[in-house]
Amino acid sequence: MTNSGDEEITPASLKATRKGERVSIGSLLPPSELVRSGESTEHIRVLAETDEDLPPIVVHRGTRRVVDGMHRLWAARFRGDESIEVVFVDGSPADVFVLAVELNRAHGLPLTLDERKSAAAQIMDSHPHWSDRKIARTTGLAASTVASLRSSSTAGTVGRRTGQDGRSRPNDGTDGRQRAAALLARNPNASLREVTRAAGISVGTASDVRARLRRGEPALTARQQAVMKLRPAAAQRSGPDYGRVLENLRKDPSLRFTDLGRRLLRLLDGSVPGSVEQIAQIADGVPEHCRTVVVDMARECAAAWQHLADQLADRDTA
């Protein structure tokens, strides 16, 4: 995450930045991913009435979306200001979200426990290689809480995770053991060093896999076999939580306080997709004499939503 001068952006470096560049308020957009579940009217009023110079807000250069400082932006609008001080940052959407979480924790209103858990879940999806402790430090949660969230998460698993010190370490070793077993099945005479290098595991793990296979046992430990049995079930539950997404959209002031925004929310409210099971139940319940009409209406609705999606996607890439 860098600024226009290719300097590394951190909460500490931004805290020391008291001067940005003046930007038109009308050119800025709210975050695409909300860290905070809603705005505090009282906090906006306090900021609007303060005589102190507030720190510049942080904005992602590529999208013009606010990374940190929505309350300051709302306060500026409340005062009738036409522009606001901005510090621009560059980076991927995933890294921008992490920075937003760090900045929200560093100053301003504290995030609630649910907000921090939601942030941790999203970081697990975008940074699955991060260790529990690294995510815990970023979100202000206990490492045990992050571990619990990860165990129930639908995010994919990775062979290695990056800790707070930046070093990469093996995860549970399941994938590495499977690679080692496959290699030894093809070449039983492979040396431990060859297995270690090809499978990305330690010499001790490679030795244990070879010993297990020679005894006729599975390459995975009992605990790892139990984890593997749970993976297919987790995969079936994967997919966006549209209920949570819609709840965040309902709290976005740019939608809540405009006629077109409220119209969009009403449309979305009646269009949030259900689970596969729920859709199957609805399909089973449609009377035979209504099926043709329902099919036509469903396809028309799908086409209309696809048209809207295409228009929005075109604007993002313009």
From Swiss-Prot:
Null allele phenotype: Cells produce only 2% of the novobiocin.
Sequence ranges of Polar residues compositional bias: 146-156
Residues in the signal sequence: none
One annotated GO biological process: antibiotic biosynthetic process
InterPro entries registered for this protein in UniProt: ParB/Sulfiredoxin_dom (IPR003115), ParB/Sulfiredoxin_sf (IPR036086)
Keyword field: Activator, Antibiotic biosynthesis, DNA-binding, Transcription, Transcription regulation
Gene Ontology MF annotations: DNA binding
Domain of life: Bacteria
Basic and acidic residues bias (residue ranges): 162-176
Family indicated by similarity: Belongs to the ParB family.
Chain's role: Transcription regulator that specifically activates expression of genes involved in the novobiocin biosynthesis pathway. Binds 5'-GTTCRACTG(N)(11)CRGTYGAAC-3' DNA sequence.
Name of the protein described by the UniProt record: Transcriptional regulator NovG
Annotated organism of origin: Streptomyces niveus
Encoding gene (name): novG
